[in-house]
């Protein structure tokens, strides 16, 4: 058995050098040699234990020199690490694994933190060198952020609650390289409010197009992960969604977003008419009851129908799903009649991605959005406003469907 390495650390000498102004940490810091020796001593113990275990099991084995690699420390600087080998090539070090080039998670955590704030690889590399006096290539940073992909896959397939009282669906578009060219793809975000009143992203789904078949696959995925019931789903007029949701969740009420409908309507109204048109339209969607709203919609059609038939036709065709919120009290109305709650998530996504332009593949986008979700979740610690009253009202309107979840 090879003689165990001794730790050679002269405390008094280190103290004198520190007093003379030499740094303890960072590049060429005084502590780097100690970290190197401690790490190599631990590796020596590992390989000796491995060889001894082979001997106990009747396998001939012995040491076979060292491999050398540069270890990038955190505040303790960088150093050359000698990792022992064995003749059979079966030794797998655990203290510092074969392809590991840091001895702490601190750098990786800092890199992921900066990446989650939307910083690009070059800026991250610069900041890491400023903080730790360690040079990290953009390729290494990319490899570190790629570790998020496994977390994304696990998150995408995680079990869901059996019921979410409210669910919103909305899309945000990005340029992604596909087949050698950049194409526009939509990222559909599914946001729910659980029985505790807390927001939760249920899933992210990428697609070049929407439609009943696409939404059927999304809803089937949610169902397969444990979601059995949604009371009210709010969407922005996504094509084919109301039909698809009735297939998987036939009892769910579908509310089309009023704000999206207004925006789409104004695209077809002349600028000079928009102020007056909006004054009349507001009487429709701000009415206290559905009957009053329908009276105002008739007046709107009488006044503007000939000039803007496509706009009034859209309101009439979608009225069944646009008017769902009228049956509920104001506490529930405020929650469901727009998709503002999910648009705020997309605003956070845009902050992260605004400097990116386009993405080389889907994973590069998903891992960044996933970090954005993790950052948002840190703030989602409290229930949505007035949740206790809202939940009580839901229990009345959806009699029996919340009984299994209500602890009363």
Annotate the PLM regions.
Residues 92, 265-292, 299:
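Metal-dependent DNA phosphodiester-chemistry modules and their immediately adjacent helices/loops
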Residues 232-239, 244-280:
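Conserved beta-strand -> loop -> alpha-helix junction used to position metal-binding or nucleic-acid-contacting
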